Amino acid sequence: MWTKPAYTDLRIGFEVTMYFASR
């Protein structure tokens, strides 16, 4: 299921966004 690079990129972007939002 998790073989789409777009999904990985989106997840990384989401992680970074949440990280900055948490700060």
UniProtKB/Swiss-Prot annotation:
Q: Which UniProt keywords apply?
A: PQQ biosynthesis
Q: Where is this cross-link: Pyrroloquinoline quinone (Glu-Tyr)?
A: 15-19
Q: In which pathway does it act?
A: Cofactor biosynthesis; pyrroloquinoline quinone biosynthesis
**What are the recorded Gene Ontology BP terms?**
pyrroloquinoline quinone biosynthetic process
| InterPro entries, A to Z | PQQ_synth_PqqA (IPR011725)
- List the HAMAP family hit by this protein, alphabetically: PQQ_syn_PqqA (MF_00656)
Entry function: Required for coenzyme pyrroloquinoline quinone (PQQ) biosynthesis. PQQ is probably formed by cross-linking a specific glutamate to a specific tyrosine residue and excising these residues from the peptide.
Give the family from UniProt. Answer: Belongs to the PqqA family.
Q: What name does UniProt use for this protein? A: Coenzyme PQQ synthesis protein A
Source organism:
Pseudomonas putida (strain W619)
